[in-house]
Amino acid sequence: MEPQFKVKIDNDSARILKELAEKKRDEGLRVVFIGPPGSGKGTQAPLVKEDYCLCHLSTGDMLRAAIEQGTETGKQAKTIMDQGGLVPDEVMVNMIKENIQTPECKKGFILDGFPRTVPQAEKLDKMLAEDNKKIDHVLDFAIDDSLLVKRITGRLVHPSSGRSYHREFFPPKVDMIDDITGEPLIQRSDDNEEVLKKRLESFHKNTTPVLGYYQNKGILSTIDASKSAPFVSHTIKSIFLSTLHFPHNASIFKTFHQKMKMQVHSTETPLAAEIL
């Protein structure tokens, strides 16, 4: 669908806008992805990671890596998991802290799978504040549960990177082969309707308070995750651009900024698709 409004930007203004966007990339971003299984987080994370030179931190991947590498946090987690227990919040936060201090996370990070509860969100904020940092954006990948069944049952995953594809909506260039590495894709054994319903019930119960926590902080943006992958990608760019500090004496940027903020919650083609 064509956007109902457009902003004409001259060459100088367009140049300034691109420079501001680059500044945003240089400053770094700390982003939390929240969404149910099948909402498209796994598709969008590599795109945002590449565009903004961020690291993608998935709690499951971090746990496995820490255990395999034998880090102190990994040893603690393994001992607890071997006894059938849940990894405490403090251990998870320490593991995240270890990861964000690596060179790969210098420009910021995408955190996927954490926090799942308000106490976890509070502990994460406290840990970041100790280093004078904070979460910049929380993206809520909102989608109706009924649409997730079709997505989940057709989902394909590249095990080592976590890249996600879909047989119908986002197929790989070659069937069952990862576009980047040429390695085989898999379909997870728990990607079925029965397991999905249980996961969704747990997700909604735990996540609703977390969304409220970030809403109160003014950093929550809700995305219509039922849209196509390119549309969602451009929406994410629009959200990031909407927080740029435009020159106060440039009326064209004030207009653009207002339109961009309006469009974050719109169903129209994001302006970021036309400009960047």
From Swiss-Prot:
Protein name per Swiss-Prot or TrEMBL: Adenylate kinase
Native source species: Dictyostelium discoideum
Comment text on domains: Consists of three domains, a large central CORE domain and two small peripheral domains, NMPbind and LID, which undergo movements during catalysis. The LID domain closes over the site of phosphoryl transfer upon ATP binding. Assembling and dissambling the active center during each catalytic cycle provides an effective means to prevent ATP hydrolysis.
Protein location: Cytoplasm, Cytosol; Mitochondrion intermembrane space
GO CC annotation, single: cytoplasm
Phylogenetic placement of the source organism: Eukaryota, Amoebozoa, Evosea, Eumycetozoa, Dictyostelia
Reaction(s) catalysed (UniProt annotation): AMP + ATP = 2 ADP
EC number: 2.7.4.3
Keyword flag ATP-binding: yes
Top-rank lineage group of the source organism: Eukaryota
Job description of the protein: Catalyzes the reversible transfer of the terminal phosphate group between ATP and AMP. Plays an important role in cellular energy homeostasis and in adenine nucleotide metabolism. Adenylate kinase activity is critical for regulation of the phosphate utilization and the AMP de novo biosynthesis pathways.
Swiss-Prot/TrEMBL GO biological process terms: ADP biosynthetic process; AMP metabolic process; ATP metabolic process; purine ribonucleoside salvage
Region (LID): 154-191
Keyword annotations from UniProtKB, A to Z: ATP-binding, Cytoplasm, Kinase, Mitochondrion, Nucleotide-binding, Transferase
